[in-house]
UniProtKB/Swiss-Prot annotation:
The name this protein goes by in its record: Altered inheritance of mitochondria protein 9, mitochondrial
Organism this protein belongs to: Candida tropicalis (strain ATCC MYA-3404 / T1)
Localization per Swiss-Prot or TrEMBL: Mitochondrion
Residue span of the annotated presequence: 1-35
InterPro entries: Kinase-like_dom_sf (IPR011009), Mito_inheritance_9 (IPR051035)
Gene name of the encoded protein: AIM9
């Protein structure tokens, strides 16, 4: 059975009327994006007084890639239109704010963190926006760099319209509060936030975060995960792993009083404002600064835009620290409700595809199984799990700890960015950072673990070497965890990984068929259940597995899984959901390999690929 890693690695309200003022034109620069292959920057010129300038629209359009299916819709969701005029006027207004530490202050639909006003710099008269450059089109946001007449730079983050308005608002509020907490409470190097807006009803005209610009190089430049073993490789890998492990160690230093996500005091409903997020705060300025509210973990918003918000609000917490099982159950509940809602929508469509109905019914069955087994998965009082009580305490979890989200300044200064989806949950219910996580078969020594390794052909050696390097990198992460937090190292147990796998797989749904991996992880537990009950690892005293599978069901599941994996490894761009980097898309289209179909989608002409195989590189 292919793991996810192997599967993926094988493929690539009304607005206040704007005040009128005289401002200078702004040069809008479309800069090269991270991971892009464009050869030249393109500059777009527009006047602030002409908001209808057609040139300006190009600056907001998504250009990083194209999709084989629903390309126009996907790009429309990723347009990041905002008011340049409104932003300019708003920046000058912030200049008059007090710099005292207080709750974010409301201003024309936005919220301002006055203590960070120094990010604007000093101006004799007005704060003027000199230029805007698009520097990155990411998976969830577009990033703009703002240059002011004070010589200061800021970052404007505009989220794509991929989730409901309520979800986008909650994520922005929580991320800003999390950044504030990391900076003021833990003293960590993260961007300071100047202002944020949680909806379109502000002078920027869009949800946004306006924060400190951090210059430097991405730590990812130093990450070479498949380098052969050597003293130099070991040192290089540690230069990336160590600062991220140290950052996580500081995150784990605070134990919270609830499970959920961080918000500012005034951003949660009244019933939650009386509960302290953690105990022992001695700084009067921080005592009532943050609170714990509903979780913004991605599973409560991703692909949930058609689920009624009142239902989501019932399931996304916060939860009492004494009841981690309720947090786990909420994931099974929301996926089950989402699948049932999708089926209801399909049944209401007279022309619905029967294959779609069949797929949704299979999803429902899987999530019913998940709902049944979730409260039994882990014994929260198990004497067989070292420091089990510590493992279940509420701690802050950042889902995107990654060298791609670390900016280095000099040798030892590392700034961490991107805290969307941060949540407070038990450490035992988290996974390793994706850049070191490995779910495949472990190989600790190539020659000892692989009989006849030296006699294998080069291709087979490369495949086993890949597995070895992935194992090595994960082990290095575990060694660092053990060094910093030996009391939490039980998460490295293979048995703990198996037991919590159904829950984690449900948090990692990317395609409509990924429910198969959830079911597969439940099936895997069946053979081990009796031993886990005997050792009090699971929350059950019944050695009989709680889910009854028929041979027919298991055979069908295995066939569906094999078909899904075959499609994934054999279909170009299946792993990316049909998304293709724009330069590659243009080249393949020019070559006739990508062709447009009658319904406006695109397809790959396999025969064309065979007719035009890649040419060998010419030697100088």
């Amino acid at each position: 059975m292919l793991s996810r890693v192997a599967r993926n690695s094988s493929l690539l309200k009304q607005l206040p009327k704007l005040r009128q003022t005289t401002v200078l034109p702004v040069v809008l620069k479309n800069s090269i994006r991270f991971h892009a292959t464009s050869s030249e920057n393109k500059e777009i010129f527009t006047k602030l007084t002409d908001s209808k300038d057609p040139q300006r629209n190009q600056f907001f359009q998504y250009t990083w890639g194209s999709w084989l299916k629903n390309d126009k819709l996907n790009k429309k969701k990723r347009e990041t239109v905002f008011s340049i005029e409104g932003l300019t006027l708003f920046l000058d207004t912030i200049k008059g704010f007090e710099t005292t530490l207080s709750q974010p202050k409301h201003l024309h639909g936005s919220f301002v963190l006055g203590q960070n006003k120094d990010l604007l710099g000093e101006a004799e008269d007005k704060i003027i926006l000199r230029s805007i450059a698009s520097i990155h089109e990411g998976k969830h946001h577009r990033i703009y760099k703002l240059t002011l007449n004070t010589g200061r730079d800021l970052v404007l983050r505009i989220p794509y319209k991929l989730d409901s308005d309520a979800a986008i608002a909650a994520k922005i509020k929580s991320e800003v509060a999390t950044l504030d907490f990391l900076n003021l409470k833990l003293g960590l190097k993260v961007p300071r936030v100047l202002s944020y807006g949680s909806d379109v009803y502000n002078e920027v005209g869009s949800p946004y975060i306006l924060e400190e610009f951090i210059p430097g190089d991405l730590l990812m430049r130093k990450w070479h995960p498949l380098s052969p073993d050597s003293e130099e490789t070991n040192k290089a890998l540690h230069e990336v792993i160590d600062p991220i492990a140290e950052f996580q160690d500081k995150l784990l230093s605070v134990t919270f009083n609830k499970f959920g996500s961080l918000y500012f005091h005034d951003d949660v409903e009244g019933s939650l404002q009386n509960d302290l997020p953690y105990d022992g705060e001695t700084n009067e300025d921080l005592k009532n600064r943050w609170r714990i509210g509903p979780s913004v973990e991605r599973q409560f918003s991703k692909n949930k835009e058609k689920l009624p918000q009142n239902l989501i609000d019932e399931l996304n917490g916060p939860w009492d620290a004494s009841n981690p099982i309720a947090l786990m159950e909420s994931v099974a509940d929301i996926e089950l409700e989402n699948a049932k809602n999708k089926l209801a929508l399909i049944n209401a469509d007279a022309g619905a595809n029967e294959n779609d109905k069949d797929l949704i019914n299979k999803q429902i069955k899987t999530f019913e199984h998940l709902k049944k087994i979730t409260p039994l998965l882990i014994n929260t009082k198990s004497k067989s799990i070292m420091n089990v009580e510590e493992l279940f305490k509420p701690r802050l979890y950042i889902p995107d700890l990654d060298p791609l989200n670390v900016i280095q300044q000099g040798k030892d200064v590392n700034y961490f960015i991107d805290f969307e989806g941060s949540t407070i949950k038990p450490f035992i219910l988290t996974g390793y950072p994706k850049f070191v996580a490995y779910e495949g078969a472990k190989i600790y020594n190539l020659e000892e673990d692989i009989p006849g390794y030296n006699e294998l052909d080069e291709l087979e050696k490369e495949q086993y070497a890949f597995m070895y390097y992935k194992t090595r990198n994960e082990r290095m992460w575990e060694f660092e965890l053990n060094k910093h937090r030996h009391d939490l190292i039980a998460v490295a147990s293979p048995h703990i990984k198996v037991i919590k796998s159904p829950y984690l797989q449900a948090l990692d749904l990317k395609t409509d068929n990924d429910h198969l991996y959830v079911e597969g992880s439940i099936v895997q537990l069946q053979a081990l259940w009796e031993a886990y009950v005997a050792n009090e690892l699971v929350n059950s005293k019944d050695s009989k597995f709680p889910i009854e599978y028929t041979a027919e069901y298991l055979d069908q599941h295995q066939q569906d899984l094999s078909d899904h994996q075959l499609e994934t490894v054999s279909s170009p761009f299946s792993a990316t959901g049909g998304w293709i980097p724009q330069d590659m898309f243009n080249t393949l289209k020019d070559q006739g390999i990508i062709v447009e179909t009658e319904d406006g989608n695109y397809k790959i002409e396999t025969e064309k690929v065979l007719e035009n195989p890649p040419k060998p590189e010419e030697k100088n």
